[in-house]
Structures are given as C-alpha cells and as structure tokens.
C-alpha cells in the first residue's frame, strides 16, 4: 500500500527567519557588506547581509551581481542621494517587514523605495497614502455637508441694486475665514425681467457654472460654526496639488464664459447685483471655496516674491526645498524637523583642537584660555584674572580664608572645596566605598572605579593617532604621545634631567632626597617606588608567576624572564662600542664598561644591535655599522696606557670557552668566542698567553674584571 504525501508548512518560519537575521545584523555577525550613506556631510556606516538586501532590493541585487572582488573582503556600497535617517528606516523595514515613521515622512520613504527599487516598501507606502487620503477626503466631505446645512439654516441676505450684499450686524464677513458672498458673479437682467424673478434657463446655467467651478479637493484652512478653530490638512504634494487646482480653475472660467445666458448679451447698460432667493441655499460652498483658493494662491505668489528677496539676503539655503535662511541655527532646525537630517555640528577650537557642546562655550574658551587679556582685577590685591568666577574663587580662597576652611586635619594639606577634602580624607582613613562587581577591588572615588572596569571590559577608548596604541586613561595617552614628539616638559631642578610625566620626575627626585616612603612589613626594608615594593614582597611570599617555557625556571619579574630567554636564543642585543663585545642585558654591559674607563658614563659605550642572531660559529655578534671592524688584539691593547709589555704576545690557535656574563644555574648553554676576545674573558687565559719572563701589569686585572 502506497503512503500519501503530506505538506509540512510553518507559518512562523518566515517571521523567525527575519527576526534572526535582524539580530545578527544588530550584533554585526556574518555581515558581508557595509553601506556607507553620506548625505550633505552627514555620514554613517550600516552593516548588513548581501542576501537580505539583494532579495528585497533590485538596486542592491544588480550591484552585488556585477561586482568583482577578492574572496574574504567585505563589500562597500556608497549612497549619496539617500538621507541617513531614511536608510536606517529602510533597513529596519527590510529586516523586520515593518517600520514606524512620521506621517510627513511617508513621501520620503516612497522616494527611497523607488530609488532602491524595493517593491514591498513602495507598495506599503502607496497603500498607506491611499488610506490617509481617503480618510481626509471623508472628513472634508462631512465638513462640507455641515457647512451647507449651516448656510441653509442661517439668515437670508438682503439684496439692493446700489450696494453689495449686507452682513448681519456685529458679524465680520471675513471673521470665519470664508470669502464674502458679495463677490459672487452678478447676473445682467433685461427685457422687462425683474431681479427677483430671473429666467429658469439662466438659473439652470448658473447651477452648472457653480458645479464646474467647484474643485474636487478644496483646501479650506478654517471653518465657522461648530468646527471653527480646527485645521484640516490634506497630505498631497504641494506642487501637484496647486497645479491641479489651477488647471481646474482655468477650465471652470472657460466653461463659464461659454455658458453665459442670452440675457448677458442684452444691450441694456443697467447692472444689477442680485442673488435669486431660490438659489440662496445652494450657493455658498462651491463659489466661496473657489474664491478662497484664488485668495490663497494670491497670498502664495506674494510670499514667493518676498522669499525671492529674502533669498538674496540670506546666507543658508536648503537644497531640498530651496528655502533660504538668514541664520545657521534656523537652517539646521529646518533640515532636522522637515527633512530628517540630524546634522552634528562640531564646535572645535582652531588653536588647541578641543571640542565644545555649543558655540557659546567655544567663544568663552577662545576669549579666556587663548587670550592673554585679564580684565577682571581683585579689589583687595589688584591681581587680574580672565574671568569673573576666577576672581570670586581667588577672593574666597585667599582673602576670606578659604584655604584654612578646607584644610586636612591629619596632614595639613589645603583643599579647594569640601568635596575635595572629603575625598582626600579617604586616603588617611582607607575608606573605599566603591567596589567592583567583577572582582574584589575597591576604590575611594567613582572615577577610579570607572577606569578600573575597563580592565574587565577590555575597553581602551583613547587611541594614539601616530601608531594606533590604545589606552584606558587619557593621561596615559598624553604621556605616550610624548614618545613621538620627544617632549619632556618636567625637568629636575637638581640635575637638569627631563621627564615625560610628572610621576617620573617625582620618582627621580627621591634619588636626590633619599626618600623611600614604601616599607616592607616583613623585613622593614624601604623602597623609593611602590612597584619596587610589590616586586620585593614576592621574595617573602615565594610567588614566581613568570615561568620559562623551555627549562621551567621561574622568576618574580617579567623582565628577568626576558633576559633569561636570551640565554636560550643566544640573543645579545647590547654591544660595547670600545671592544665590540655583546651582552644579553644592560646591567652586565654597565659593569663591563668599568674595564675601559670608570669616569666615562656607561651609556656612552652602549650600542643596541637590532635582531641579534645566535652566534653558532663562535664569531662575535654582527656589528650595526658595516664599516665598523673589530680591532686586532694588539691594537686594542695599545689603546690603553702602559701596554707595551704585551708587544711580544703569542697568538693561540683555536677557541677557548668564554666566561658567561650572566650568572645562571643553567649550564647547558655555553658561548664560544674567538681569540680576539681572550683579553676580556679570563685572567687564566692571559696567563698562558704572557711570556713567563714578563710580569703582568698591576692594572690588568681591572681590565678583565667580570661579573
């Protein structure tokens, strides 16, 4: 028996698929295209998936199918004709099939959909506009009917041959926003016909003329009666709407001329203004709307003429709607609320590059910080300041005893405010109320906790423009930049040495003062720097966190591990420029330089060799300068005083083991040097080289004094 087939269909799968793709885009996962939207200086990058964009937009589909790129590289698509806010809404619609926008932006979204060829979004916008238009037309129809009912139930207008239609006392004809009914087209009556009884044919033609002149979508701003004070807006593009009304108005005027009744051709010169009593109920709506439209269009033409004059005087002009503005603030507000372009104005100081929230703060900064003018003097001591608040602070702290009012009771330090004093007192009490939620660290200030949290999050917001190095704190970036500029603004007054940071100078001054404020609680040994104390404490605790991956030896400091690694690799990056010998660390080189000259600073002998290779063949490390040649043994001896005793030195064939300059328990690594290095290796080797009849100079052991 054959089994039938069944259909497995999930109604929620499409929605779930869209939801998951939307989540992936928000997290930036699996995105293979970056859409860069740059519109009138406002730029933003959007990450997305090619498959989703190509499936919903024919524009992106054509771009992706025609592109030629290398595998593994992300595609960049540049859009300059779409606003950032509109493309963000477009992306949300593509990934969620729905987006919420303001009513006045529906037309913009329709234009974006047409540019990007997104049929789904285009159909959605058109359907929504149709619904909006139908609702507005229905409201206008109800409004028109209510106006006709009110007009029919209102008082009758008396007609006189010599004047226009009168208005009831105390009521302004234009107070309700409608055009006066006296402007209604007049009828010329003759052949003995009285004004009160016009011919039936003329009345019929008059009705036709009114019907033709009545626009289908009248634009009425305000209404009288029950709806007075309410505004009715029709969401139709202005240019198309006004053009359509003008065409209908012209056609209505032509029809009115062609359909004039025979009585209009009468030679009778008597002109009578009349309004048939039988038509008094049907006249108000259509004719008044036509008159109101003519009035509105006349006002628009006057406004356009005024706008043309203002544009000549204006400094800022909108490229979207050609509206001109005299001030930048008004222009920015216009493009933000009417076109959705949220421009980010950056107020940056040209001198120091600092940015500010508004123009006022920038002007204040330029006026007070970069200006040497001091217009605000102190009345007590005549000292001048740049700002008034600086004078107030000066008077408060200096003349009114502000320093004594905020002075620490334990150390006597004066603080500028109570808040600063309270924070300072925590250094004495040890109070640390701000604790980290991810570790046991505690801090006395919230700013210190915020900086500490970057250790857990990995955030390094401060980036160096030169090398791309990132830092957790701004002052660390400032110190780092001085490595590139070579700036050392902090100089020691004792020895004249300069430093890049104030902290380094503070540590250096302890060399001259002999201050060692950090004491070990175990052995009572004192140190000049806190970091040195931390390293020393590991001696008591036995902690050796740094382990060699080749021999397993452990160290308390990372730089000690780095020096130890050079024993395995044979790297000797530090060379003595007097004898050409190389060393694994600077401390050994410093001790070695005392052989040559104790009075000369050891750094004058230092030469750093980049990428020093391992010396497998017993030759010295390669010199950094190709023209530099290692001097011969006899030449090197003659370079020192009283070395004439060694003129008869014998050359020794072969190589001898050299003394290790680094004390280490690892005896597996041996270094082999040539006979040119015998002089500075061991005293015993020199004893073999020297003839027995010649006595060794007394100063020679100092030349070969090693570690």
UniProtKB/Swiss-Prot annotation:
Primary site of residence: cytoplasm
Signal peptide: none
Any one of the GO CC terms: nucleolus
Keywords annotated in UniProt: Cytoplasm, DNA-binding, Metal-binding, Nucleus, Phosphoprotein, Repeat, Repressor, Transcription, Transcription regulation, Zinc, Zinc-finger
Summary of subunit composition and partner proteins: Interacts with NCL.
Function, in words: Transcriptional repressor that binds the GZF1 responsive element (GRE) (consensus: 5'-TGCGCN[TG][CA]TATA-3'). May be regulating VSX2/HOX10 expression.
Similarity comment text for this entry: Belongs to the krueppel C2H2-type zinc-finger protein family.
Protein name: GDNF-inducible zinc finger protein 1
Organism taxonomic ancestry: Eukaryota, Metazoa, Chordata, Craniata, Vertebrata
């Amino acid at each position: 028996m054959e089994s039938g087939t069944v259909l497995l269909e999930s109604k929620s799968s499409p929605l779930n698929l869209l939801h998951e793709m939307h989540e992936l885009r928000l997290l930036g996962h699996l995105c293979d295209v970056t859409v860069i939207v740059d519109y009138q200086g406002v730029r933003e990058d959007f990450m997305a998936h090619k498959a989703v964009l190509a499936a919903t937009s024919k524009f992106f589909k054509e771009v992706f199918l025609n592109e030629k790129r290398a595998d593994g590289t992300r595609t960049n698509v540049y859009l300059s004709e779409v606003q950032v806010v509109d493309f963000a809404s477009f992306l949300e619609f593509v990934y969620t099939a729905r987006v919420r926008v303001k009513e006045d932006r529906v037309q913009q979204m329709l234009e974006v959909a047409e540019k990007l060829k997104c049929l789904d979004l285009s159909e959605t916008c058109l359907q929504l506009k149709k619904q909006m238009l139908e609702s507005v037309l229905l409201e206008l129809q109800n409004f028109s009917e209510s106006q006709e009912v009110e007009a029919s139930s209102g008082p009758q207008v008396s007609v006189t041959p010599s004047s226009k239609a009168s208005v009831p006392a105390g009521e302004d004809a234009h107070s309700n926003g409608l055009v006066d009914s006296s402007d209604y087209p007049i009828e010329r009556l003759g052949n003995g016909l009285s004004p009160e009884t016009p011919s039936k044919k003329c009345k019929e033609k008059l009705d036709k003329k009114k019907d033709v002149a009545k626009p289908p979508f009248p634009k009425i701003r305000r209404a009288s009666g029950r709806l007075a004070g309410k505004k009715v807006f029709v969401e139709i593009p202005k240019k198309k709407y006004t053009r359509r009304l003008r065409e209908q108005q012209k056609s209505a005027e032509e029809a009115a001329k062609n359909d004039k009744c025979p009585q209009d051709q009468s030679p009778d010169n008597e002109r009578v203004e009349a309004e048939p009593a039988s038509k008094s109920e049907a006249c108000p709506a259509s004719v008044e709307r036509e008159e109101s439209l003519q009035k509105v269009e006349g006002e628009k033409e006057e406004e356009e003429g005024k706008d043309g004059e203002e544009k000549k005087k204006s400094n800022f002009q909108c490229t979207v709607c050609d509206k001109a503005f005299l001030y930048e603030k008004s222009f920015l507000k216009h493009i933000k609320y009417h076109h959705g372009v949220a421009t980010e104005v950056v107020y940056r100081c040209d001198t120091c590059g600092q940015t500010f929230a508004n123009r006022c703060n920038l002007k204040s900064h330029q006026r007070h910080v970069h200006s040497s003018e001091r217009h605000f003097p102190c009345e007590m001591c005549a000292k001048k300041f740049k700002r008034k608040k600086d004078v107030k602070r000066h008077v408060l702290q200096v003349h009114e005893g502000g320093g004594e009012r905020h002075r620490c009771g334990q150390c006597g330090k004066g603080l500028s405010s109570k808040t600063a004093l309270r924070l300072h007192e925590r250094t004495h009490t040890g109070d640390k109320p701000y604790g980290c939620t991810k570790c046991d660290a505690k801090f006395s200030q919230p700013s210190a906790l915020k900086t500490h949290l970057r250790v857990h999050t990995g955030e390094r917001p401060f980036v160096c423009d030169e090398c791309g190095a990132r830092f957790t704190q701004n002052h660390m970036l400032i110190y780092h930049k001085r490595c590139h500029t070579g700036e050392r603004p902090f100089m020691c007054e004792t020895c004249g040495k300069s430093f890049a940071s104030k902290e380094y100078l503070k540590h250096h001054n302890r060399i001259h003062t002999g201050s060692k404020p950090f004491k070990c609680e175990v052995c009572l040994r004192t140190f000049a720097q806190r970091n040195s104390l931390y390293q020393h404490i590991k001696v008591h605790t036995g902690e050796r966190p740094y382990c060699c991956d080749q021999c397993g030896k452990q160290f308390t400091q990372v730089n000690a591990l780095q020096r130890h690694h050079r024993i395995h690799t044979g790297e000797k990056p530090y060379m003595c420029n007097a004898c050409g010998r190389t060393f694994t660390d600077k401390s050994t080189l410093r001790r070695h330089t005392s052989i040559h000259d104790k009075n000369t600073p050891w750094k004058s002998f230092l030469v750093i060799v980049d990428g020093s290779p391992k010396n497998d063949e017993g030759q010295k490390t390669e010199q950094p300068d190709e023209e530099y040649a290692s001097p011969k043994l006899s030449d090197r001896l003659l370079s020192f005083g009283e070395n004439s005793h060694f003129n008869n030195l014998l050359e020794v064939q072969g190589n001898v083991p050299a003394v290790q300059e680094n004390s280490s328990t690892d005896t597996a690594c041996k270094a082999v040097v040539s006979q040119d290095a015998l002089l500075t290796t061991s005293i015993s080797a020199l004893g073999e080289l020297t003839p027995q009849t010649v006595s060794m100079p007394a100063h020679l052991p100092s030349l070969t004094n090693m570690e």
